[in-house]
């Protein structure tokens, strides 16, 4: 079966593993997925992420993060721009997630970055997802 939206599949794997308190989750790798995983790590939503070379496209392994009493660090994860309906934001329309408590991951002309960094650099682009 052909996968029409690999990024949505990646986010769903993370969401499902987070819901059932898994320690780690694996997904097929791509440049975009690596960039998203690194942003999640840098923003403190996941413990760590690593790339495993399997001779094909590779695998991304993400170690999920939980609080001391098993509270989820990732409360929500939502795909915004989909293959059937792309969502773009100009530099003055970059969204804030939960008043700045969450992040929007945006694909800009200078790479994939958070909404804060895009606003700081004065860039717009495709809104990939929201994480809170």
Curated annotation (Swiss-Prot):
GO terms for biological process: translation. The keyword rRNA-binding applies. GO terms for molecular function: rRNA binding; structural constituent of ribosome. Keywords: Ribonucleoprotein, Ribosomal protein, RNA-binding, rRNA-binding. It comes from the Bacteria. The keyword Nucleotide-binding does not apply. GO terms for cellular component: ribonucleoprotein complex; ribosome. Gene3D superfamilies: 3.30.1370.30, 3.30.1490.10. Belongs to the universal ribosomal protein uS8 family. PANTHER family: 40S RIBOSOMAL PROTEIN S15A (PTHR11758). Part of the 30S ribosomal subunit. Contacts proteins S5 and S12. One of the primary rRNA binding proteins, it binds directly to 16S rRNA central domain where it helps coordinate assembly of the platform of the 30S subunit. This is Small ribosomal subunit protein uS8.
């Amino acid at each position: 079966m052909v996968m029409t939206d690999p990024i949505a599949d990646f986010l769903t794997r993370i969401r499902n593993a987070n819901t059932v308190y898994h320690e780690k989750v694996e997904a097929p790798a791509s440049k975009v997925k690596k960039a998203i995983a690194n942003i999640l790590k840098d923003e403190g939503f996941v413990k760590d992420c690593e790339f495993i070379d399997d001779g094909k496209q590779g695998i991304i392994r993400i170690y999920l993060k939980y609080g001391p009493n098993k509270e989820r660090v990732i409360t929500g994860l939502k795909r915004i721009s989909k293959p059937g309906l792309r969502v773009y934001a100009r530099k003055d329309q970059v969204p804030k997630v939960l008043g700045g408590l969450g992040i929007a991951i945006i694909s800009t002309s200078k790479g994939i970055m958070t909404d804060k960094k895009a606003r700081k650099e004065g860039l717009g682009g495709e809104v990939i997802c929201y994480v809170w």
